[in-house]
Curated annotation (Swiss-Prot):
It is an enzyme of class 3 (hydrolase). This is Probable isoprenylcysteine alpha-carbonyl methylesterase ICMEL1. Substrate binds at residues 214-216, 285-287. GO terms for cellular component: endoplasmic reticulum membrane; Golgi membrane. Expressed in roots, rosette and cauline leaves, stems, flowers and siliques. Its EC number is 3.1.1.n2.
Amino acid sequence: MPSQILQISHHLPPKSSPSTEMMFKSLIYDDPSTTLLSRFGDDHHTISSTVKPLLSRSSSYNGTAMKTSSSSSAGGFTGWYQNRRRRSNSDNCLSAFSDDTNGTADGGNNSGDRQTTIGQEVGHAAAETFLLTRLCLKLLSYLGVGYRWITRFMALGCYAFLLMPGFIQVGYYYFFSPYVRRSIVYGDQPRNRLDLYLPKNSTGPKPVVAFVTGGAWIIGYKAWGSLLGQQLSERDIIVACIDYRNFPQGSISDMVKDASSGISFVCNHIAEYGGDPDRIYLMGQSAGAHIAACTIVEQVIKESGEGDSVSWSSSQINAYFGLSGGYNLLNLVDHFHSRGLYRSIFLSIMEGEESLRQFSPELVVQNPNLKHIIARLPPFILFHGTDDYSIPSDASKSFAETLQRLGAKAKVILYEGKTHTDLFLQDPMRGGIDEMFEDIVTVVLGDDQEAIGKSVDRRRLVPEFMLKLAHWVSPF
């Protein structure tokens, strides 16, 4: 039965004022046939204070606001960018890699692959272990013994224990599947590596999702995206999970630089692995959503001629998917402090209080001097759970409203009762139908109804009672 769309209007905006489209999705055990759609008018004032740009660049894109209907899942939103003019960019600043080997998309050998050998990977793992141990000791000196941090750490242990059956199965897939290409080098900095998750079916170029993992800017790692990579690859989508330097190994500018280098590698080399360079989607989760948003905004500023030379084009990004992200750091500092990510640590990560505006995409796009970059931004689709206490869902709503008010394409989908980790971990481990997963697949596959309708048996990885307990003890 098609979803029922209920229009709820708090107050009608002027006809000349764009509105942000927001969808509320019910819990999986609620009535899935009911979807509430509300439009929010423009009550905000443009921030006139100068905002230092992240970095820069752009791509011409014009269109009207998306309209959602009960039948839009097959391609309503995809119409936003299907006719976008894509530019190819052969410029590649990452042409030399010292520890490359060969391999193919289907697990064989090919001269185009840059995957390390087992011996190199063991050596790399040992070096990384030593490095991360030293960094953890340094990190502990920042954290001290704050009671909030200690309680979160204990809750994290319980949470990981409850989901361990799923982690073991995903870990086995990650290390032993011939369709996972681990630790492909994309740059010359520490942790400049990415993992590729390849479909079993190698016919035809595949759409690609470049994924930036979360981890509070401190504990992010490329393997955190292995469950997403496995499940999307089962739907004939290539996933590139990009690793990056965490704090204190690097600060936010290093993270954005690494993410940009990883995206550049994907844009310039994904065809060697069976990917379609004209169908690339950028996705981030939690801190990764913030880093990815900073990266794409920085890129369009660069492209507009206000930054350094570029090695990839924002026009290659068909859409941005932001999962449970925060985009206005000024509004989140106190909240993070109350949750155990203390102000002193957070400001160190973000390179000082004076840099918070520079690394807040929601504020950067409102800079009056950067109005010309809006048309170059890809469509933004933001996903958030209404019971997310790590980063409140208002963060996504506010960013979407700001983008839409400025003329960019933006949509926020809220999932009723979902927490910070439900959408990314518990729901995928539950098996069966996953609303957010299907929402992503529908956009990525576009009008390919055959691929969208492909039946994939998503098996349960963790017993239901353990998932429910994990929901309650999650420190995120």
